């Protein structure tokens, strides 16, 4: 799992673009600069890892574009030790960014292949998250309440069960 000077340089350029687009939270920028996005992508797309676009990761899912990850993460206003529920692990990139910011991350993925791949990768990267293979629609009431909840997959509505698992003010 190489993270070369080229990758680091490309991340610096990506950070400049995110700042130009209005991302101001230094913790978000630091986390995105620290997490090697290319490790979360299919080998066919490696040379595009730091382009601000979404790319396929299998099971008809995508790794979100960096701006989307930065924008949503900035909206969360993460504080160290926040207990965060992520619905839709996907590649694991968003969970890794949240973990890098000091969040205690619980992440759910319904696609078995993506769940196994992201769990293996994040474990290798020493990203200590709670991984659950399930449909995120019901959330994780056994671990509630959560300071923050982020839905990173397509959802026609916010399930009421998730709202009930959010701390007041979360």
Show where each model-derived region lies.
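Class I SAM-dependent transferase core
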Residues: 1-85, 93-97, 101, 114-117
């Amino acid at each position: 799992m190489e993270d070369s000077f080229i990758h680091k340089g490309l991340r610096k350029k990506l950070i400049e673009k995110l700042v130009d687009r209005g991302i101001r939270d230094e913790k978000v920028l630091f986390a995105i600069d620290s997490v090697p996005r290319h490790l979360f992508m299919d080998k066919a797309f490696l040379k595009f890892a730091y382009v601000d676009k979404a790319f396929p990761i299998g099971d008809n899912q995508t790794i979100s574009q960096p701006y989307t990850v930065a924008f949503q993460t900035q909206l969360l206003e993460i504080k160290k030790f926040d207990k965060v529920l992520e619905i839709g692990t996907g590649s694991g990139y968003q969970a890794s960014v949240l973990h890098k910011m000091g969040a205690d991350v619980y992440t759910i993925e319904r696609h078995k292949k993506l769940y196994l791949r992201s769990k293996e990768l994040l474990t290798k990267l020493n990203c200590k998250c709670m991984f659950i293979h399930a449909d995120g629609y019901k959330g994780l009431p056994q671990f509630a309440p959560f300071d923050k909840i982020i839905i990173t997959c397509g959802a026609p509505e916010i399930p009421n069960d998730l709202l009930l698992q959010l701390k007041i003010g979360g």
